[in-house]
Amino acid sequence: MSKTPIYKVSFFNQGQIYEIYARHIYQSDLYGFIEVEELLFGERSGMLVDPSEEKLKAEFEGVSRSYIPMHSITRIDEVAKEGVGSITEAKAGSNVSTY
């Protein structure tokens, strides 16, 4: 693993499942929230553009820190390298739902 860990955070927001990558995750001083800093997005290395990742970049443009409610988070993983972030629609009858 790299010296600075990379975290993959999956959370549920407004009927969609978000998957983001970040360098720092903390328990926030705001009760019930997780603080996520230094969001990572893939570099544009060619002609292929992932519309889901572009939507994610646009939504978090200019954001240095995000506070996510603990009850919305479905999973946090420490990963070896950054992947592609995404926003997907939560399917009806899925195991993922809000509390």
Language-model-derived ranges and their functions:
Residues 1-99:
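Eukaryotic intrinsically disordered, low-complexity regulatory linkers and tails enriched in Ser/Thr/Pro
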